[in-house]
Regions:
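C-terminal capping/lid segments that line or modulate ligand- or cofactor-binding pockets
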Residues: 88, 155-157, 346-352, 357, ...
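Active-site acid/base region of carbohydrate-active enzymes
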Residues: 135-137, 141, 292-326, 332-333, ...
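Extracellular/oxidizing-compartment recognition motifs
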Residues: 1-345, 353, 370-373, 387-395, ...
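Helix-terminus loop motifs that line ligand-binding clefts
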Residues: 57-68, 244-256, 369-475, 612-635
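Non-catalytic C-terminal accessory modules of carbohydrate-active enzymes
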Residues: 108, 112-119, 132-165, 177, ...
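Alpha-helical support elements that line or immediately flank enzyme active sites
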Residues: 36-40, 220-240, 271-274, 284-287, ...
Length: 750
């Protein structure tokens, strides 16, 4: 039966969060109800209720898509809620559709008119089906939500909240003209509350405000239980860090990150579910006198897409364990709606470059297949809209907005997300369908790169982000890196062409495989000719240049070893401090360890002085920072405009932690065949890595025992392992439990 529901909106816009409702009486004479399903959508975000009960635990439904091209619908089984006579209510928030988006202060970039859509299908025991959809017979009323914005927060007046089970009269609605072909069923996991956190500390700041520390930087909101004078307001502000003993809001830039709760005079419970904040600390003002805020009054609510954790790592080094935990929390906070760069300031956008470098880590830690596959649909649609150029933000709400960059064509890393992300999904989960669906997008990006190459065969023209946020770059010039942009872009283009050729072979597309193998070979030759000196040095002599050339396979034999040796010299000269940005950081430890410099890779990984991965850990970080020095050693905040304390890109090193420190990596897509090759180093005496692969749980653990390295491996029955230990011949093992030893004399410990 075709749907007849239409998008509707109040005739008179209330300004914020209208309730759209209708009373539904099931048809008589058809026996008992056997099933009832409610499908909802919105231009905005929607919470659906039946007789005052939420239909699901989902929040911020239906998430964020490229609204010009598709709008998600979400279906819920509501059989238990549909009785003789019920009120179906939709509360509509601004969300990503009408709220603020981007750092330029813009709002309503998709449109200034909220709209809700719903279809209730009731099936009776005689087979009769009753369908009730949104149309102009519905009504509208207020919700008690006076303001709602993802960046700025939410204001709720408890005195104005309606009883959603008792709605009768309301204001008229009108139908909004939306092409029904835009509606698509959601494929990915919903956004949901994941965890409740009690405060670890509540105290008074010098300003007199009450501060709450939840002990972890996370994303979501607080819910509050309070009783006070009617009309009085409790205000909650949020931030990731403190500075000068007060809430540090400067890094939020223009995001107000403020929730306000207007009290009714009775016992009120508030939960601002039409916004989200990135925070560890909350500042509370206006709390009723005579009853100080306690741990029972305020709760942190962790919110993100409902992803299943599949990968774990733990070692004997607690600082390294905390770094890994920080990477996990960074993913949790930024996989909300779409994979974002940061969750707290006036940005929170789907920057493609951040995900491109982080995706191997993401696919190991969580089952991200459906979440990222759906995001890739929007990438392909946005790319097609631009004639083959991959935008740097997906979804891209900033079309036509001056964002301070020149008009962008294809860019290395950021544009490469069109290829690197589906490739990583295939490697992690073994489902070739994602390659098939994204193949046109992948090849379009590769061909656009080819069109932009210079006559010399390298990619050295046009705007590039380069090694973004190189720690030696000035705070206000994050693009000003040591590594030459042409070196970075050409190396990435080679990697991209090789992946497209590999995807073509996996799909049986021989013509495209030859096309992109040829492109890769040409890029490799041009890279060597234009950028590699006779003594093995690479143009710009920067760590990122060597890391990419080695990790991407641009060098062979002597040249490769020369590059690894030179990289080691540079790292030693820097005191083994990290000196790479977005481009080089994910690959520098791999470049060192794969050229025989495992000890130097560990010295880099375990460095605690700034800049380093562990410096933020020593400063109390519980997520990965945007900058190596987002907080300076004296506790002050980096003066740069971009200073996020929850930015997962630099946490991409976790991929190397899993594969080299932990010793587990795939040899075939979906971990059908795996490499077991831990390389101990530093002060580590043990480590354990586990993965719930498509074939079952894989576990690799090792410990130093006397004079031996002892490795335990557990493989599912259908998974084959290749065991590679220092000083030992490779061994192929079937599924099952295995123990191996190697003399410690074969190890080079850092």
């Amino acid at each position: 039966m075709p749907n007849t529901a239409r998008f509707i909106t109040p005739v008179d816009d209330p300004g914020s969060a209208p309730v759209l409702f209708r009373r539904v009486r099931p048809d008589r004479g058809h026996g008992a109800i056997t099933s009832a399903r409610l499908t909802v959508s919105a231009r905005g975000v929607v919470e659906a209720w039946i007789d005052g009960e939420p239909v699901s635990p989902d929040v911020l439904t239906p998430g964020w898509t490229s609204y010009e091209f598709r709008i998600r619908t979400v279906t819920h089984d509501v059989t238990r809620l549909v009785g003789d006579d019920v009120v179906v209510a939709l509360v509509i928030g601004n969300g990503w559709y009408r709220g603020h988006l981007g750092w330029m202060g813009n709002s309503a970039l998709y449109g200034d008119e909220l709209a809700g859509w719903a279809e209730l299908r009731i099936v009776f025991e005689d087979g009769h089906e009753q369908v009730v959809g949104t149309d102009d017979s519905w009504s509208a009323t207020g919700s008690g939500i006076l303001e709602d914005d993802l960046y700025d927060g939410q204001t709720i007046d408890a005195r104005l909240r309606p009883d959603l089970a008792a709605l009768t009269d309301g204001e008229p609605v009108r139908v909004v003209d939306v092409d029904p072909a835009l509606l698509v069923e959601s494929e990915g996991p919903a956004i949901r509350r994941q965890e409740l956190r009690r405060p670890e500390k509540i105290w008074q700041a010098p300003s007199g405000a009450t501060l709450v520390d939840f002990g972890q930087n996370f994303v979501g909101w607080v819910k509050v239980r309070v009783q006070g004078p009617a009309g009085s307001t409790v205000t909650v502000r949020y931030a990731e860090v403190l500075e000068h003993e007060e809430l540090a809001t400067r890094p939020l830039r223009n995001a107000k990150a403020t929730d306000r709760f207007v009290l009714s005079g009775g016992v009120d419970e508030f939960e601002p579910t039409f916004t989200f904040h990135g925070f560890r600390y909350a500042e509370v003002t206006g709390w009723p006198e005579g009853s100080p805020l306690s741990e029972d009054d305020i709760t942190g609510v962790v919110v993100h897409n409902d992803l299943r954790r599949i990968g774990h790592f733990r070692s004997s080094n607690e600082l390294l364990n905390q770094l890994h935990a920080n990477v996990v929390w960074g993913l949790r906070g930024n996989f909300l709606g779409v994979p974002t760069d940061c969750p707290q300031r006036d940005e929170r956008l789907g920057w493609t470059g951040d995900l491109a470098v982080f995706v191997p880590t993401a696919t190991f830690l969580y089952d991200t297949k459906d979440f990222l596959s759906e995001w890739l649909r929007d990438l392909a649609l946005e790319q097609a809209h631009l004639g083959g150029t991959v935008p740097v933000i997906v979804p891209d709400p900033l079309k036509g907005v001056d964002i301070g960059f020149p008009p962008l064509d294809a860019t290395a890393i950021w544009g490469d997300a069109a290829v690197w992300v589906p490739w990583a999904l295939w490697e992690a989960y073994g489902d070739v369908a994602v390659l098939s669906r994204q193949f046109d997008s992948m090849t379009a990006h590769g061909r656009r790169i080819r069109d932009l190459l210079s006559p010399s065969g390298v990619w050295d023209a046009g705007f590039q982000f380069g090694d973004w946020l190189d720690p030696t770059a000035p705070p206000e010039e994050p693009w000003n890196s040591k590594a030459d942009n042409g070196v970075v872009a050409t190396a990435c283009a080679y990697r991209t062409a090789g992946m497209i050729a590999g995807a073509a072979r996996a799909l049986g597309r021989q013509d495209e495989a030859v096309e992109f193998d040829t492109m890769a070979a040409s890029l490799r030759s041009a890279f060597t000719r234009e950028y590699v000196e006779p003594d093995g040095r690479i143009h710009s002599d920067a760590p990122t240049a060597y890391a990419l050339a080695i990790a991407f396979g641009l060098l062979d034999g002597t040249a490769r070893q020369q590059a690894g040796d030179r990289l080691t010299e540079i790292m030693a000269a820097s005191g083994h401090h990290i000196s790479t940005g977005f481009a080089g950081t994910p690959f520098i430890t791999e470049a060192l360890s794969s050229t025989g410099h495992v000890a130097d890779a560990y010295r880099l990984l375990l460095q605690t002085e700034c800049p380093s991965w562990l410096y933020p850990v020593t400063m109390g970080a519980t997520t990965v920072w945007e900058r190596w020095d987002s907080m300076l050693p004296d506790g002050s905040i980096n003066p740069g405009e971009m200073t996020s304390f929850n930015h997962y890109a630099l946490g991409a090193v976790a991929d190397w932690i899993h594969s080299v420190v932990g010793g587990l990596s795939p040899l075939e897509p979906g971990y059908a065949r795996v490499l077991i090759a831990p390389m101990p180093g530093g002060d580590l005496t043990s480590a354990e890595t586990t993965l719930d692969s498509p074939h079952g749980r894989i576990s690799v653990s090792w410990r130093l025992d006397g004079g031996d390295l002892v490795v335990h491996a557990d493989l599912p029955s259908e998974v084959e392992g290749l065991v590679r230990l220092p000083g030992r011949d490779d061994v192929v093992v079937p599924g099952g439990s295995h123990v191996f030893t190697a003399p410690m004399s074969n190890l080079v410990l850092g």
